[in-house]
């Protein structure tokens, strides 16, 4: 079993309006940085056409500007949990533009696993390297694609 290498834009195309996405990372260090700006571009394009485009975001903690900032500014976040520190995101929450659940970080995995947050439609992970051995060991699904 192998894996497909696709562009960040193609990886973002898997994310549709209304989806819930799970993002890796605990602070900006492990958060995806290439795909989320491409999701923001899709949101801008859809909004320019008069179409809705908003997603739910589940993370391990705060993600930084490459996710919470850019997606807040283009009004692409419908729901977000848990903790985050981005000022653009906080402003959008305080203006009633984003539904936010500030649950404790230790509760997030169980909430998602038990289905209390709804299903995760797409997971986007930051990775330094994925090797063919990783895929042979089944660390990658049959639908694994790498966005660069």
Segments (PLM) and residue ranges:
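Conserved alpha/beta enzyme-core scaffold
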Residues: 1-148
């Amino acid at each position: 079993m192998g894996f497909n290498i696709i562009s960040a834009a193609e990886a973002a195309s898997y994310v549709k309006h209304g989806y819930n996405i799970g993002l890796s990372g605990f602070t900006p260090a492990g958060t995806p940085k290439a795909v989320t700006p491409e999701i923001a571009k899709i949101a801008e394009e859809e909004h320019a056409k008069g179409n809705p485009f908003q997603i739910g975001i589940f993370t391990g903690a705060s993600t930084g500007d490459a996710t919470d900032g850019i997606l807040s500014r283009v009004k692409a976040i419908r729901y977000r949990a848990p903790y985050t520190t981005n000022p653009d995101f906080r402003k959008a929450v305080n203006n009633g533009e984003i539904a936010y659940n500030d649950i404790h970080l230790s509760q997030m995995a169980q909430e998602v696993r038990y289905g209390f947050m709804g299903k995760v439609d797409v997971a986007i992970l930051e990775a330094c390297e994925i090797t063919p051995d990783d895929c042979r060991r089944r660390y990658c699904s049959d639908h694994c694609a790498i966005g660069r």
